[in-house]
Amino acid sequence: MNTEQSAEPHYSNSKCLISTPEGKDLKNGAVKRTPSSKFKRVHSNFKSPLQVPESAKVSPAEEVAELEGRREQLDAEIAQLEVEGCRVEELEHHIDMLHEYNDIKDIGQSLLGRIAAVRGTTTRDLYSHFGLELDD
Protein backbone atom coordinates (compact mmCIF):
# COMPACT_ATOMS: atom_id res chain seq x y z
CA MET A 1 0.00 0.00 0.00
CA ASN A 2 1.50 3.34 -1.01
CA THR A 3 1.18 6.00 1.72
CA GLU A 4 2.68 8.87 -0.31
CA GLN A 5 0.37 11.50 -1.76
CA SER A 6 0.01 11.50 -5.51
CA ALA A 7 0.68 14.74 -7.37
CA GLU A 8 -1.19 13.48 -10.41
CA PRO A 9 -4.28 15.38 -11.35
CA HIS A 10 -7.52 13.44 -11.11
CA TYR A 11 -10.88 14.16 -12.68
CA SER A 12 -14.03 13.93 -10.61
CA ASN A 13 -17.42 12.80 -11.95
CA SER A 14 -18.27 16.41 -12.87
CA LYS A 15 -15.09 16.62 -15.01
CA CYS A 16 -13.42 19.07 -12.60
CA LEU A 17 -9.67 18.86 -12.26
CA ILE A 18 -8.68 17.77 -8.74
CA SER A 19 -5.11 17.45 -7.48
CA THR A 20 -3.78 16.32 -4.15
CA PRO A 21 -0.71 18.21 -2.89
CA GLU A 22 2.42 16.27 -1.95
CA GLY A 23 4.31 16.17 1.38
CA LYS A 24 5.18 19.72 2.44
CA ASP A 25 2.68 21.09 -0.03
CA LEU A 26 -0.05 19.31 1.91
CA LYS A 27 0.34 21.72 4.82
CA ASN A 28 1.05 24.88 2.84
CA GLY A 29 -0.83 24.29 -0.38
CA ALA A 30 -4.06 22.82 0.88
CA VAL A 31 -7.04 25.05 0.43
CA LYS A 32 -8.65 26.04 3.72
CA ARG A 33 -12.38 25.86 3.64
CA THR A 34 -14.48 28.42 5.44
CA PRO A 35 -17.46 26.78 7.07
CA SER A 36 -20.72 28.13 5.77
CA SER A 37 -22.50 30.20 8.36
CA LYS A 38 -25.34 32.66 8.53
CA PHE A 39 -23.10 34.91 10.63
CA LYS A 40 -20.92 37.52 8.94
CA ARG A 41 -17.52 36.69 10.42
CA VAL A 42 -16.76 33.06 11.12
CA HIS A 43 -13.08 33.48 11.94
CA SER A 44 -13.40 36.60 14.11
CA ASN A 45 -11.71 36.93 17.49
CA PHE A 46 -13.57 35.81 20.60
CA LYS A 47 -15.69 38.55 22.08
CA SER A 48 -16.71 38.14 25.70
CA PRO A 49 -20.40 38.66 26.45
CA LEU A 50 -19.36 40.67 29.52
CA GLN A 51 -18.50 44.17 28.40
CA VAL A 52 -16.90 46.55 30.90
CA PRO A 53 -17.66 50.16 30.07
CA GLU A 54 -14.79 52.64 30.16
CA SER A 55 -16.45 54.55 33.01
CA ALA A 56 -16.46 51.41 35.20
CA LYS A 57 -12.70 50.89 34.93
CA VAL A 58 -10.89 51.91 38.11
CA SER A 59 -7.35 53.17 38.29
CA PRO A 60 -4.85 50.97 40.17
CA ALA A 61 -4.46 53.59 42.92
CA GLU A 62 -8.24 53.68 43.49
CA GLU A 63 -8.38 49.89 43.50
CA VAL A 64 -5.57 49.69 46.10
CA ALA A 65 -7.32 52.27 48.29
CA GLU A 66 -10.60 50.34 48.01
CA LEU A 67 -8.90 47.05 48.93
CA GLU A 68 -7.11 48.61 51.90
CA GLY A 69 -10.45 49.97 53.14
CA ARG A 70 -12.01 46.52 52.77
CA ARG A 71 -9.10 44.97 54.69
CA GLU A 72 -9.56 47.47 57.53
CA GLN A 73 -13.28 46.66 57.62
CA LEU A 74 -12.57 42.92 57.80
CA ASP A 75 -9.94 43.44 60.52
CA ALA A 76 -12.55 45.36 62.55
CA GLU A 77 -15.05 42.51 62.09
CA ILE A 78 -12.43 39.96 63.21
CA ALA A 79 -11.62 42.06 66.29
CA GLN A 80 -15.35 42.29 67.12
CA LEU A 81 -15.76 38.52 66.83
CA GLU A 82 -12.73 37.94 69.07
CA VAL A 83 -14.25 40.30 71.67
CA GLU A 84 -17.45 38.23 71.51
CA GLY A 85 -15.42 35.10 72.30
CA CYS A 86 -14.98 33.49 68.88
CA ARG A 87 -11.66 31.77 68.31
CA VAL A 88 -10.01 30.73 65.05
CA GLU A 89 -9.47 27.18 66.34
CA GLU A 90 -13.17 26.86 67.15
CA LEU A 91 -14.11 28.12 63.70
CA GLU A 92 -11.74 25.63 62.05
CA HIS A 93 -13.30 22.83 64.14
CA HIS A 94 -16.80 23.83 62.98
CA ILE A 95 -15.65 23.94 59.35
CA ASP A 96 -14.14 20.45 59.68
CA MET A 97 -17.38 19.18 61.19
CA LEU A 98 -19.37 20.72 58.32
CA HIS A 99 -17.13 18.97 55.79
CA GLU A 100 -17.67 15.65 57.57
CA TYR A 101 -21.44 16.23 57.69
CA ASN A 102 -21.54 17.00 53.96
CA ASP A 103 -19.52 13.87 53.15
CA ILE A 104 -21.90 11.71 55.22
CA LYS A 105 -24.94 13.36 53.62
CA ASP A 106 -23.53 12.75 50.11
CA ILE A 107 -22.98 9.07 50.92
CA GLY A 108 -26.51 8.79 52.31
CA GLN A 109 -28.03 10.34 49.20
CA SER A 110 -25.97 8.04 47.01
CA LEU A 111 -27.22 5.02 48.95
CA LEU A 112 -30.83 6.21 48.68
CA GLY A 113 -30.35 6.57 44.94
CA ARG A 114 -29.01 3.03 44.63
CA ILE A 115 -31.83 1.60 46.76
CA ALA A 116 -34.36 3.46 44.62
CA ALA A 117 -32.79 2.05 41.45
CA VAL A 118 -32.89 -1.51 42.81
CA ARG A 119 -36.50 -1.16 43.97
CA GLY A 120 -37.53 0.58 40.75
CA THR A 121 -38.86 3.64 42.56
CA THR A 122 -37.85 7.25 43.05
CA THR A 123 -35.74 8.73 45.81
CA ARG A 124 -38.72 10.97 46.64
CA ASP A 125 -40.73 7.85 47.54
CA LEU A 126 -37.85 6.53 49.65
CA TYR A 127 -37.62 9.81 51.58
CA SER A 128 -41.24 9.37 52.71
CA HIS A 129 -40.66 5.64 53.36
CA PHE A 130 -37.75 6.39 55.73
CA GLY A 131 -39.49 9.40 57.30
CA LEU A 132 -37.16 12.01 55.80
CA GLU A 133 -38.07 15.49 54.64
CA LEU A 134 -37.23 16.39 51.04
CA ASP A 135 -35.14 19.34 52.21
CA ASP A 136 -33.00 17.13 54.50
From Swiss-Prot:
Residues 61-92 form a coiled coil. It is found in: Nucleus. Pfam families: Swi5. It comes from the Eukaryota. Gene3D superfamilies: 1.20.5.170. InterPro entries: DNA-repair_Swi5. Keywords: Coiled coil, DNA damage, DNA repair, Nucleus. Residues 1-43 are annotated as: Disordered. GO terms for biological process: double-strand break repair via homologous recombination. One of its GO terms (cellular component) is Swi5-Sfr1 complex. Its main location: nucleus. Residues 1-17 have a biased composition (Polar residues). Belongs to the SWI5/SAE3 family. Component of the swi5-sfr1 complex, a complex required for double-strand break repair via homologous recombination. Component of the swi5-sfr1 complex. This is DNA repair protein SWI5 homolog. It comes from Anoplopoma fimbria. The lineage of its organism: Eukaryota, Metazoa, Chordata, Craniata, Vertebrata. The gene is swi5.
